[in-house]
């Protein structure tokens, strides 16, 4: 009662891993112990600012922004409204390439524009160097942080369930894109493969014709990435998705993920295609701490894979396209 003379404050959080988070890269809400009230805190300069800004750039929004009925403090609602002012910076298809592709500015430039807008009149250039210091990248650039450290730090912050994926061709100066998993349906994967990566490949071919140094290496790496992404699009085993609680006729055919099945199961083909860089990372810049080992507990006899797995909750299973297509046809013919 002494700490909360006005009663418990309404919910608030500056932690982007919480549903209650207001969504603003640098906004803060603090509890004033002298007055016993919530108030607007100072603009944040911590290790989460760049992570939130990248997520916003990729079009991600937090539950508190989308649910007007969520119980939230007025101070948090203030930042939800300020977050809405940043929506024009969000990429429409949830694909942001690190180099400039198709006339879009490179990711680092777009991210900087969003940061400047987030801090508003408080922005000074030393804020960027302080933010980079917070993410263990002192004296370096936003572009190299995106290429080298963003994804590893993103996986760590969000408990190894990344929702922004860093897809690359294995070259430090090659093709790389950040992709919003929540928007990565079949159509968007095709857009990544044939529109963005396709444009990059065309440019490398032109550079090769002009005998520009490094073009052959970049072209080979980009075409290698394109082939791997096509394997995921097609989804023949072992580049398939397997969902333990779905019967054979409801298993995804090719890249047609049900986002409700979660990152852990849907990310598998991106990690199982032949690796372009780090061991077992597939086409991702680093491998998240994700496994498909057997889950705890036993399945009920009515579970679709109970008999095959003898009640064990097996996730590391693969199915051919032929098996799945036949099962769908049989179910449709019933």
Write out the residue ranges for each language-model feature:
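Beta-strand-rich extracellular modules
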Residues: 4-6
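Terminal accessory regions of large proteins
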Residues: 9-334
